[in-house]
């Protein structure tokens, strides 16, 4: 198994893969160049907190996917960027015949695993800490596991949950939904925050496999989640 760290500006990848000499860093660099070039011409794409209307047809794949995920999740395109880079990086490795790859990009994960794997849940919760994770059964298809927080990280969030973790077939969608649902984690106490976020999740049930919401001493979930297990404490580079 190969382990690799890739740091390119705001992209911080931790990679575990069964592929040697995968050239993923070069692939991600090209993705970032396409994204940065598009942003210079389309400030709304970069700055909007809502989906952006467009009529362009000749777009690079990363821009297309971010537009699509944004429209599904009712967030701005950049709310989906980290998950999209993870998703496309995983697709690239799968195209090279990988059967086991985990790509973590600042807490947004894309994974394919032909054997059992454990994925940590980063919440920084004062009670749970960073010592729990999902035990993932072997699967042949990609899975996105993305987390948003109102308390940690540099991404914009209007809610106050310790963490909202979304599991979806596409990491770009999981990333956008984590942002959208986390924005609704508001209320006079942690119970209300979890309840309001769960209510918001109901509007997107066709897009996710499961959602886990952690706020202080309250935890809520919707959909089908993997088994939650205890892990060693870990940190994520945001």
Curated annotation (Swiss-Prot):
InterPro entries: ApbE-like_sf, MA1715-like, UPF0280
Family listed: Belongs to the UPF0280 family.
Protein name listed in UniProt: UPF0280 protein Msm_0088
Species in which this protein is naturally found: Methanobrevibacter smithii (strain ATCC 35061 / DSM 861 / OCM 144 / PS)
């Amino acid at each position: 198994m190969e382990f690799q760290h890739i740091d390119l500006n705001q992209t911080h990848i931790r990679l575990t893969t069964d592929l040697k000499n995968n050239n993923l860093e070069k692939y991600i660099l090209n993705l970032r160049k396409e994204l940065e070039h598009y942003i210079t011409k389309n400030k709304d794409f970069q700055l909007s907190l809502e989906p952006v209307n467009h009529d362009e047809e000749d777009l690079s794949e990363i821009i297309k996917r971010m537009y699509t995920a944004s429209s599904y999740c009712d967030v701005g395109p950049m709310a989906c960027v980290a998950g999209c880079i993870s998703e496309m990086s995983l697709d690239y490795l799968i195209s090279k015949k990988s059967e086991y790859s985990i790509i973590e990009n600042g807490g947004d994960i894309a994974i394919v695993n032909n054997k059992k794997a454990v994925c940590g849940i980063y919440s920084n919760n004062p009670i749970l800490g960073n010592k729990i994770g999902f035990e993932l059964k072997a699967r042949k298809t990609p899975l996105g596991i993305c987390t948003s927080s109102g308390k940690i990280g540099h991404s914009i969030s209007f809610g106050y949950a310790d963490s909202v973790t979304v599991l979806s077939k596409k990491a770009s969608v999981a990333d956008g939904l984590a942002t959208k649902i986390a924005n609704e984690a508001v209320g006079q106490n942690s119970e209300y925050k979890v309840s309001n976020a769960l209510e918001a999740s109901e509007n997107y049930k066709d897009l996710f496999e499961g959602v886990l919401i952690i706020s202080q001493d309250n935890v809520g979930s919707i959909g089908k989640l993997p088994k939650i297990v205890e892990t060693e404490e870990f940190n994520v580079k945001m």
